[in-house]
Amino acid sequence: MAALIQDDKGRYLITRRRGGSHLAGMWEFPGGKREPGESLEEALRRELIEELSATFSVGEKVQTVRWQYPERTVVLHFYRCRFESGTIEPLEQQAMEWVEPARLAELEFPPADRELIARLR
């Protein structure tokens, strides 16, 4: 799952994947993987606390993408999320930026995110 988080200026919060991970160095929308027994929404709330030190409400699902990379298949569920409380800061030593929608296409995102990015611009 991944969160589409916008600030009051309409910018999206993105984070950079750490070195040593699948697609290292690329930008992405914050999120992660579901643990057994979690709903997608519960997992996304947990991941956002773990990654960003803040709580968010999970809103509508915007898109689901299934993408086949040479080494694995991923299914991504993108949700609109709204900040609730805390201080947004990256806890997993990753870079974080607020980016205008028009700039998203200029940055290096995983191929699975491209269709969504085209919709957000």
What is each of the regions a protein language model found here?
Residues 22-26:
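A conserved beta-turn-beta hairpin within the catalytic core of GNAT-like acetyltransferases
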